[in-house]
A protein has these predicted regions:
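Alpha/beta-hydrolase active-site loop
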Residues: 290-325, 342, 352-367, 371-372, ...
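Gly/Ala-rich beta-loop-alpha elbow adjacent to hydrolase catalytic centers
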Residues: 246, 332-340
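Cap/lid segment of the alpha/beta-hydrolase catalytic domain
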Residues: 248, 252-255, 260, 272-298, ...
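N-terminal cap/lid segment of alpha/beta-hydrolase-fold proteins
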Residues: 184-236
Length: 539
C-alpha cells in the first residue's frame, strides 16, 4: 500500500509538476496527456479537465484521482502555475527556438514530451512554444497544451524524472552553499557595522580620464575589431587592465567598470568580440549563425593578445610610454570569464571519448561548458594553450570553468579571482566556478567570491542585451552589485598589478561585508578542499 501511495504521489508530481519546471510543453489540439509507468500501467489526464480546473476550480472525478495525492497547498497553487505567463518577449522566444542551442534544448525536452510514443516531440514542441508565445495571454502551460498540434501528448516519465532530478539537485546545491557560506546574521551584528560609503575602493578615484577608440586585427576574423582605451591623466606609466565581455554583450556592458578602474590609476582596454557581441548573438537567435563555433574558443583569447600587440607596436609612442604592457590584468564575464582563465594559463584538453558529445546522448539544456567542450573536440587538437606572459593577474566573473577540467585549470600560475553568483542558472556555480576554484593550485594566490543571490546578469550594464530571459532570472537590479565589483577589481589589481599590498585589507570579509545591501551579500574564500565542498553539498 505504501508503495502504491508513493507511486501515485510521484506520478502526479512528475506529470503536473513537469509542466512548470519544463516549460517547453506545447499544445494546440491536445486532448489528453498520456503516460506509462511500468509496472503499474498506462494513465492519462484530459486537457479539458485541467482547463476547467484552472478556470473554475472544479475538479473532475478523473482529475481528482491524481490531485488528491498532492498536498493541499500544492493543489491550491496549481491553477496559478498553469495559467501564469512567462515574462518573455515572443520574438526572442521564436528566434531562440530556431537557434542552434534552442533546437538542442527543445530536442532534449522532446525526448520526454512527444507527439508520438516512438518519436522525439521536437517539431510539435517548437511549433507550440512559438504559437503560445504569440498568444495574447502569453506563454502559459495551458496555452502550450492548447497549441500542441496533435491530439495526444505522450510523456516519458523516466526522462522527465531525470530532468527534474537534475534541476532539484542544482537547487539543493544552491541551498547548501547558502547555508554553509551565508549563515543567518543576528540583528546586533548588523547594527555594529559602520560603513562609510565615501571611502574605499568602491568610490570613484581621483583621476580624470580620456577615452579613445582603436581597431585591432585578428587574422582569424574576416574584419577588424574595435576596442576602447581609457587612460587616466597621469604622466607616468601605469598598468593595463583588459575587459572581455560575454555573450550578447559589447563594449558598453562594462563601461562603468572601465571608468571606475581608470579613475584609480589604471589604463583600461575594453574589447568588442565580434563573434559573440549583440549583433552576432541576435543573428544566432535568428538561426543565421551557429554558436559556439569551434574557433570561438581560440579567437576570443587571441583578440586580447592582438589588442596588446597593437598597443605595443602600432599606437602613438606617447601613449605607449604611459602604459606598462608587461603589467597587464584581465577581467572577463561568462564567455569572457573563460577568456580570462585561458589567458591566465588554463588549458583546454580534448576528450575524444566524450560520449555526451554524441548526438544521441546530448542533454544540452543550457550547459554551455559541455556544448563548448564538444565543439572544441571538433578542432582535432589534443591541447590548447593560450596563456600570455604579459598578463599577471586575472578575474573571472561567472566563467565557464568546467570546460578546462581539473588538469587544465591547475595549469594557472598567476593570481586569480573567481566571482560566482549563487543563483546563476546559466552557468551553475558549483560545477562552473566553485569546483574549478578547488582545482586551482593550493600555493596560488587565489580568491573565490560568492555573491548571494547573484545571477549571470548581476554585474552587467542594465538595459543591454538580446537574451530572452525573465526578470526572475536576471535577479535584483545590477546597480546594487556595482559597488562590490568596483571594490573587488580595484583592490585585486592594486595588490597584484600596482604592487600596493595595503589594498589586501579590502579583500577580506570584514571589508566586503560592509558593502552588503538589501539586494546582495558576498563572502570571500581563500581555501576550500574537495572534501570540504563534498561535505557541504552532501548535507
Amino acid at each position: 500500500m505504501v508503495l502504491i501511495q508513493n507511486f501515485k504521489y510521484k506520478l502526479v508530481s512528475l506529470v503536473l509538476g513537469a509542466s512548470a519546471v519544463l516549460f517547453p510543453v506545447t499544445a494546440t489540439a491536445a486532448e489528453k496527456i498520456e503516460f506509462n509507468f511500468p509496472p503499474f500501467g498506462q494513465f492519462d489526464i484530459e486537457v479539458e479537465d485541467l482547463q476547467n480546473f484552472v478556470e473554475t476550480g472544479e475538479i473532475s472525478t478523473e482529475l481528482a484521482y491524481y490531485l488528491n495525492r498532492l498536498p493541499p497547498d500544492q493543489i491550491a497553487k496549481l491553477p496559478e502555475l498553469l495559467s501564469t505567463p512567462l515574462e518573455l518577449d515572443p520574438v526572442s522566444i521564436a528566434k531562440f527556438s530556431n537557434s542552434t542551442i534552442g533546437e538542442a534544448v527543445i530536442k532534449n525536452f522532446g525526448k520526454g514530451i512527444k507527439g508520438d510514443v516512438n518519436q522525439n516531440g521536437f517539431y510539435a514542441l517548437r511549433g507550440a512554444i512559438i504559437a503560445a508565445a504569440f498568444d495574447p495571454e502569453g506563454l502559459t502551460v495551458m496555452n502550450l497544451l492548447r497549441e500542441f498540434p496533435l491530439s495526444t501528448i505522450y510523456v516519458d516519465l523516466e526522462v522527465i524524472d531525470r530532468y527534474i532530478e537534475r534541476g532539484k539537485r542544482l537547487f539543493e546545491y544552491r541551498q547548501a552553499i547558502d547555508t554553509a557560506f551565508f549563515p543567518v546574521e543576528s540583528n546586533s551584528n548588523k547594527s555594529q557595522r559602520r560603513f562609510n560609503s565615501e571611502i574605499g575602493p568602491q568610490v570613484l578615484g581621483k583621476y580624470s580620464w580620456q577615452k579613445q577608440t582603436f581597431t585591432y586585427n585578428n587574422p582569424n576574423r574576416s574584419k577588424k575589431g574595435y576596442f576602447d582605451l581609457y587612460q587616466p591623466t597621469i604622466e607616468r606609466s601605469v598598468p593595463l587592465i583588459v575587459i572581455s565581455h560575454g555573450l550578447a554583450s559589447d563594449r558598453q556592458t562594462f563601461a562603468y567598470l572601465a571608468e571606475h578602474l581608470t579613475s584609480h590609476g589604471f589604463a583600461v582596454a575594453v574589447i568588442e568580440h565580434d563573434d559573440i557581441n549583440l549583433n552576432k548573438f541576435d543573428n544566432f537567435l535568428s538561426g543565421s549563425e551557429r554558436f559556439p563555433e569551434p574557433n570561438n574558443l581560440i579567437d576570443q583569447p587571441l583578440d586580447v593578445k592582438y589588442v596588446l600587440d597593437r598597443l605595443e607596436t602600432q599606437i602613438n609612442p606617447r601613449l605607449q610610454n604611459k602604459i606598462n604592457l608587461q603589467q597587464v590584468g584581465v577581467i572577463g564575464q561568462s564567455f569572457g570569464g573563460y577568456t580570462s582563465l585561458a589567458l591566465a594559463g588554463g588549458e583546454l584538453i580534448a576528450d575524444k571519448e566524450a560520449t555526451q558529445c554524441q548526438e544521441e546522448n546530448r542533454e544540452v539544456l543550457l550547459d554551455l561548458s559541455s556544448l563548448a567542450k564538444c565543439t572544441f573536440n571538433e578542432l582535432n587538437r589534443d591541447r590548447l594553450q593560450l596563456a600570455d606572459p604579459r598578463i599577471k593577474a586575472a578575474i573571472a566573473i561567472n566563467p565557464l570553468g568546467k570546460i578546462f577540467g581539473r588538469e587544465g585549470i591547475s595549469a594557472i600560475e598567476i593570481p586569480t579571482m573567481i566571482i560566482s553568483g549563487t543563483n546563476d542558472l546559466i552557468v551553475p556555480p558549483v560545477a562552473e566556478q566553485i569546483k574549478p576554484f578547488v582545482w586551482l593550485d593550493d600555493d596560488l594566490d587565489k580568491y573565490l567570491v560568492l555573491v548571494k543571490p547573484g545571477t549571470h546578469f548581476s554585474f552587467l550594464q542594465e538595459g543591454l542585451g538580446v537574451l530572452p530571459v525573465p526578470d526572475t532570472v536576471v535577479g535584483p537590479s545590477p546597480t546594487s552589485a556595482y559597488p562590490l565589483l568596483k571594490a573587488l577589481s580595484t583592490a585585486f589589481f592594486k595588490v597584484h598589478l600596482a604592487q600596493q599590498p595595503e589594498y589586501r585589507a579590502y579583500l577580506q570579509n570584514d571589508s566586503l561585508q560592509q558593502l552588503d545591501n538589501d539586494a546582495f551579500k558576498s563572502t570571500i574564500i581563500f581555501d576550500l578542499t574537495e572534501a570540504q565542498l563534498q561535505e557541504i553539498i552532501d548535507r
